[in-house]
Amino acid sequence: MAAPPCPPRRPISAPCFLLCFLLGFVAGLFPFAHRHLHLDLHLPLPPPATAILVREDPPSVVVDVDTPLPAAAEERKLLLVVTPTRARPLQAYYLRRLAHTLRLAPSPLLWLVVESGAATRDTAALLRGCGVMYRHLSSPVPDAPQDRPRRRGRRQDRPAVDSRARQRNTALDHIEHHRLHGIVYFADEDNVYSLDLFYHLRDIRSFGTWPVATLAPGKSKTILQGPVCEGSRVVGWHTTDRSKNQRRFHVDMSGFAFNSSKLWDAKNRGHQAWNYIRQLDTAKEGFQETAFIEQLVEDETHMEGVPPGCSKIMNFHLHLEDKNAIYLNGWQTTQNLDVIIPLKKEARPLL
């Protein structure tokens, strides 16, 4: 039996559609949530990129114009430590010992190591690993007395040339040429130095000196040589060598230091009688120090006792090296390498 046909759909009229739309719109205007439920649908907006921040005024500071401002800390003076050296058995030991002391000294410090003759690779390798700012220089070797030309009718009684004086002069030439401003100090490698010495060196304004203790070989007594001070004023000298009483200043080579500007600025010297400040390589033994100091100062009034009162021994001059020791160049030898006593081969028992 066939199903009855569906009635045709009637099209929705426009007035009915508008009525449903208005009812839905009006219903959306009334809140249907619980009255105790509050929803914060208003989220805070981020501040704009061009927002202006208002800061509070800083507290007012009263400045006294009459009160002087604190002075900036004075920069440390450069220490120019000059050390002459030469190839010998204890050279590496002396240089390493001095390098350990200089490494503990406050910076800035420049170590001028001057070799007698051409600069060697062994010394250069040692200086590269010492941890101290340095400059490796070389000085020409002085001629031996038998190599000097002889003249008829004249006695050959010229004093021996001090190679260390030429080495120190090479360092002074380097300092003057490059205008290295600081305190110049001659530190021989075989001496023993206290760390306090390098702190007091920067207190020197023009020329400073202090006593040095010397331990002579084969003697149990210590010889003291240097100034006698009242405060920072030098009033006398310690000396026990009567054969050197003719010296003007009884100072050891490692017992004084001076401002490097004395080398090129005559106004900073005690007198202007010398135009070229260098050590005399032909001076007699024991008179090298006083001959050089006489070029820097005129008398004791131009000296400063370091430290005040000269009450500290800050370095020792030792004589511990054997002059007859044999030094092998590069610490290598090709002689006496044969076996003198061979080992006996003993029969080992079988296990």
Curated annotation (Swiss-Prot):
Got a GO cellular component term for this one? Golgi membrane
- The protein's predominant localisation is Golgi
Give ranges for the Cytoplasmic compartment.
1-11
**Superkingdom, according to UniProt?**
Eukaryota
What UniProt keywords apply to this chain's record, in alphabetical order?
Cell wall biogenesis/degradation, Glycoprotein, Glycosyltransferase, Golgi apparatus, Membrane, Signal-anchor, Transferase, Transmembrane, Transmembrane helix
Q: Which residues lie on this side of the membrane: Lumenal?
A: 33-351
Asked if the Swiss-Prot or TrEMBL record annotates the protein with the keyword Transmembrane helix, the reply is: yes
CDD domains, A to Z: GlcAT-I
Q: Identify a single GO molecular function assigned to this protein.
A: xylosyltransferase activity
- Give the span(s) annotated as Disordered: 138-169
GO terms for biological process?
Answer: cell wall organization; glucuronoxylan biosynthetic process; plant-type secondary cell wall biogenesis
Enzyme Commission number(s) from the entry = 2.4.-.-
Chain positions carrying an annotated carbohydrate: N259
Membrane-protein topology? Single-pass type II membrane protein
Compositional bias, Basic and acidic residues, is annotated for 156-169
Q: Where in the cell is it found?
A: Golgi apparatus membrane
Transmembrane segments in this chain: where? Answer: 12-32
- Role of this protein: Involved in the synthesis of glucuronoxylan hemicellulose in secondary cell walls.
Q: Which family does it belong to?
A: Belongs to the glycosyltransferase 43 family.
Q: What is this protein called?
A: Probable glucuronosyltransferase Os10g0205300
